Swiss-Prot record:
Disease tied to this entry: Defects in ARID5B may be a cause of susceptibility to coronary atherosclerosis in the Japanese population.
Transmembrane segments: none
Domain ARID: 318-410
Cross-link (Glycyl lysine isopeptide (Lys-Gly) (interchain with G-Cter in SUMO2)): 130, 445, 494, 496, 767, 774, 803, 810, 893, 916, 920, 935, 988, 1000, 1013, 1055, 1070
Domain notes: The ARID domain mediates the interaction with DNA.
Native source organism of the sequence: Homo sapiens (Human)
Cellular location(s): Nucleus
Keywords from the UniProt entry: Activator, DNA-binding, Isopeptide bond, Methylation, Nucleus, Phosphoprotein, Transcription, Transcription regulation, Ubl conjugation
Polar residues compositional bias, start-end: 597-609
Modified how: Methylation at Lys-336 prevents DNA-binding. Demethylation by PHF2 promotes recruitment of the PHF2-ARID5B complex to promoters.
Region span, Disordered: 251-277, 412-611, 846-874, 891-918, 956-978, 1028-1070
Name of the protein described by the UniProt record: AT-rich interactive domain-containing protein 5B
Amino acid sequence: MEPNSLQWVGSPCGLHGPYIFYKAFQFHLEGKPRILSLGDFFFVRCTPKDPICIAELQLLWEERTSRQLLSSSKLYFLPEDTPQGRNSDHGEDEVIAVSEKVIVKLEDLVKWVHSDFSKWRCGFHAGPVKTEALGRNGQKEALLKYRQSTLNSGLNFKDVLKEKADLGEDEEETNVIVLSYPQYCRYRSMLKRIQDKPSSILTDQFALALGGIAVVSRNPQILYCRDTFDHPTLIENESICDEFAPNLKGRPRKKKPCPQRRDSFSGVKDSNNNSDGKAVAKVKCEARSALTKPKNNHNCKKVSNEEKPKVAIGEECRADEQAFLVALYKYMKERKTPIERIPYLGFKQINLWTMFQAAQKLGGYETITARRQWKHIYDELGGNPGSTSAATCTRRHYERLILPYERFIKGEEDKPLPPIKPRKQENSSQENENKTKVSGTKRIKHEIPKSKKEKENAPKPQDAAEVSSEQEKEQETLISQKSIPEPLPAADMKKKIEGYQEFSAKPLASRVDPEKDNETDQGSNSEKVAEEAGEKGPTPPLPSAPLAPEKDSALVPGASKQPLTSPSALVDSKQESKLCCFTESPESEPQEASFPSFPTTQPPLANQNETEDDKLPAMADYIANCTVKVDQLGSDDIHNALKQTPKVLVVQSFDMFKDKDLTGPMNENHGLNYTPLLYSRGNPGIMSPLAKKKLLSQVSGASLSSSYPYGSPPPLISKKKLIARDDLCSSLSQTHHGQSTDHMAVSRPSVIQHVQSFRSKPSEERKTINDIFKHEKLSRSDPHRCSFSKHHLNPLADSYVLKQEIQEGKDKLLEKRALPHSHMPSFLADFYSSPHLHSLYRHTEHHLHNEQTSKYPSRDMYRESENSSFPSHRHQEKLHVNYLTSLHLQDKKSAAAEAPTDDQPTDLSLPKNPHKPTGKVLGLAHSTTGPQESKGISQFQVLGSQSRDCHPKACRVSPMTMSGPKKYPESLSRSGKPHHVRLENFRKMEGMVHPILHRKMSPQNIGAARPIKRSLEDLDLVIAGKKARAVSPLDPSKEVSGKEKASEQESEGSKAAHGGHSGGGSEGHKLPLSSPIFPGLYSGSLCNSGLNSRLPAGYSHSLQYLKNQTVLSPLMQPLAFHSLVMQRGIFTSPTNSQQLYRHLAAATPVGSSYGDLLHNSIYPLAAINPQAAFPSSQLSSVHPSTKL
């Protein structure tokens, strides 16, 4: 600028679009230079006829496109100069502000300042602070700092103050300040308090903080403003140009032509003006440093660039622009890349001429790209300064629209836009990444829905076809879905994890249509499961060692997610036989997808391994395979099951989908499948390839006893395959029964299965749970009964070994998933009324022995799958599945050493708590709780679905109840004492970990403490069973005597218990469980009639085990009583609690075997405690903490 013209003072303080903001400007007043800075008050006259008013400078900026130097000020008038005039309400020092800020060009503002203001006599005349005193005591810097921070919005005004000091501004005779009314009051109050002190005290930090104002001018005038008014004639002033108001609010409108700006700003002037100061303050810091350089360049550039096209609008410029556009369009058309539509940049259509001119001034494309100055071009175009991709977008548009022409003009070779290529590479890389992610997600979603549909319609369209070909193929598909090679166990795990991630995206789709997905998955899975059952079902010799590694994998917290699912899948597989397992597997995959947050590890395999060291390992592996394969396998049983209860299956199947995805790769190769499980358990989703290989080799080295490759992904089936589960349960229960008979019993048809399991399972499971699993894998009817107890034993044994690790994982999962999933389908039975449960038990028992045995077991499997689904996710927390763990642990009763291998979750309907009686059980309980919580959504759906199933069908009426009632009655009879022991154990366990195991507690289970409680209860039950070595909830003798008898007795006991418990506040629970399990805890009639009749006096209860469990073994997971048990007053009653502990202590704290104790605890507690919620007092006493 010219020496005597307007000049900006100081560095720019902000940049916003085409605006560059400044802190001060200098002009000449009466031949002397004067500086006005932001926040300054000065006298002005808008016109020579207008009264004197005070202007507060709030914003200074330059519009680069038009080279306008603009200001925004707030005007204050004396009351007498306002239309209303002064009245008695106005103070002598009061001024009234104009409601709208005025936008004035600096040249006009300077004219306003040129006037005689000597007549102004208003305002409070404050004593000035003597600068000499300030200089002596060094308070001047403090004052300047205060003014800078308080009065200048924190902007750095040092340069401006220095300029002012050089000009002697501080000693200006006329200085006026307008305060807010509160500030004015505080100031006057402070002056009154220090009236006898020297004025320099106003510079004290405390005086300033209390409202003091240190004015260094000779004649400071203090006024205040507390009101505004609308000035009638201000708008008519020619100097005011609101059309130039900076658009700093709302959606950025970019730089618009003046006429447009007038239109757009005319109505927004006030709001824009009001925000000018603050907006500038915000923008100032943002652009202060960046603007200093760009500003100068941009000012020059834009002045030259845009002055021609816009400001200087000369014919020459217009002609140049027109000629450029004609030549550009012609050239681009000739090179067969015509410019059809000019894109928008920052909500404004690009001006090609402006862009070209700006680029040329900066040196052209190559120079701008090398210097990374595309943001400058963007600013030239008036783009949104807040855009984070402005530079890239500008460069891409330039490359596409102008770069070819620029090269043509310069005589350069018309390359295929080499610079554009990098840009395209960035774009394409990002786009590819996005596409890859999206496509991967879509692919997974695609595959899962496809699998669902295929499974529904035909077991092998794509995924189904692959699955039908082999479980391994299905695993491959899952692996491909997970985008990880299936050969390595680590790869499998990674793939599964990726699948989870992709499924996490897919969950949007699959969760939206979980039932559908699960249904289809189960449909195709059922057939594929049948194939797998044929392939692997008959081959119980799956590597038990590999399964054990899987269990370790399940123990891994990171891997706990899949393991949780896997155990439930394992349970389902066992219950539904291999077909059922595979059926659930597909759903497991979708569930995995739906819950991608959970690590795609495969602890469930570990659970299963624990369940049967020999067979359970195979079972875990089989379940892992099934978990993956079920998605692609579709057996007719699964098909039916899907048709019967697709919704329930969907929820669990989603959880299982995750597990299945995890286990799918394992299915491909038993060794591989197991390796992922091992990997999951051993590692929280992160495993070195070597470790994975080792696990894989271990898994493959030890043949899984049951061919189920994690074969039962019950969670998958539980939602969509609830019905299929019933059907599959009938078929699978036999094959699955051996491996996961307990698990199956825990399924929705758990009542029937529980009865059967309890009758034939106690001794069988205790003796050879692994053998039974193998046997029942082959034979489905028996497996229905034994499936639960055995499967529970497997989880129990598994949980015993993995309890601590699993519990850690479970605790984490519980915390993570307790909130996300507030419903646990596995506890649906808890929601059923006792009377209904009784009828259901009878119905289920009847059906179990008849055709319903296959259907409802399928349902049980579904429920288990639900339960497992939840547990599997929790197992990511180190607790695969409480229910499956319970079964595994019970199995461990017979093979306590082997049990550690099994860590797969059992059905949610199954008593998951029994799995957690030991420290390991505790871990499993946590795992179950976590997975259950994570699967809470799915399971909640399952709950509804099961509830529907349960009510319509006696067997189904208590999907949870089935597991609970059947197993519970047996469990009760099996563990009259053990029940108390289990209760005690449960309390101990609850202190350790309380996964959600109660059917009725399903929603709460999803919560943190409650869900864990139930899991603990179930774990304790399982532990108690393990101790007593009784696989089924009934007496070992009773169980041995006959599953049928146990089933009938269970039904009767359930009915009786239900009858008693119905009145006792456990209507919605499986009363048979409570009463048989806790004779001492409950009222004499209830406990004695229900429990004593079923359980031998010396029968060890899982609760008993629980009591000792936490104390005895860190592996033992806390036993979680079903809400029924809780409501029964087991825990609420001090006497009962004493009895419980007595029972626990007396009835073999450890029991004859951990497996027996686990088994007992699993069935009775799981069955007895279907209630969703324990009384708070009971919960607190039974479950002191959610975690170990």
